[in-house]
UniProtKB/Swiss-Prot annotation:
Keywords: Calcium channel impairing toxin, Disulfide bond, Ion channel impairing toxin, Neurotoxin, Secreted, Toxin. It is found in: Secreted. Gene3D superfamilies: CAP (3.40.33.10). One of its GO terms (molecular function) is toxin activity. This is Cysteine-rich venom protein asurin-1. It comes from Austrelaps superbus (Lowland copperhead snake). Expressed by the venom gland.
Amino acid sequence: SNKKDYRKEIVDKHNALRRSVKPTARNMLSMEVNSKAAQNAQRRXD
């Protein structure tokens, strides 16, 4: 879906920016979409 593509684009860009940090982080985990967290955030916003 278009929403899923948009989320992936955001996550990919976010992770690319984090990888480009100088000096590099020693223990920086990649961000990924969490559907449950997204649903909770949407309920709060509604």
